[in-house]
Amino acid sequence: MNNSEFSKIAETTIAYIAEKIEEQDKEASIDVDLQGDILNLDTDKGVYVINKQSAAKEIWLSSPVSGPYHFFYEQGKWTNRAGLELMAILTEELNIKFDTRPT
């Protein structure tokens, strides 16, 4: 995947995460702040940070619950080396339902 393709997929994914949280968080318990390619989610558990790392072609997640993760895009999913999927972690920790393939 070239840099342009990566940027498009990563930015679409990050925007999708922000949109899904805003749609499903009926009690407005998660403060969503999307600035460029950095998404901050302020929750009662702490602040999540999701951003794209262009040089590594990864999306990084900093979770106040489970720590830091680096995800690479493969076969339509953002997965880390341990096989964990970005959307699965967010679903579990934020109680928001995400499709595994938003793009």
Swiss-Prot record:
Keyword NADP annotated: no
Pfam families, sorted: Frataxin_Cyay (PF01491)
A GO cellular component entry from the record: cytoplasm
The keyword Cytoplasm is annotated on this UniProt entry: no
SUPFAM superfamilies: Frataxin/Nqo15-like
Keyword vocabulary terms for this entry: Iron, Metal-binding
Gene Ontology MF annotations: 2 iron, 2 sulfur cluster binding; ferric iron binding; ferrous iron binding; ferroxidase activity; iron chaperone activity
InterPro entries reported for this sequence: CyaY, Frataxin/CyaY, Frataxin/CyaY_sf, Frataxin_CS
GO BP terms: intracellular iron ion homeostasis; iron-sulfur cluster assembly
Recorded family membership: Belongs to the frataxin family.
Purpose: Involved in iron-sulfur (Fe-S) cluster assembly. May act as a regulator of Fe-S biogenesis.
Protein name: Iron-sulfur cluster assembly protein CyaY
Name of the coding gene: cyaY
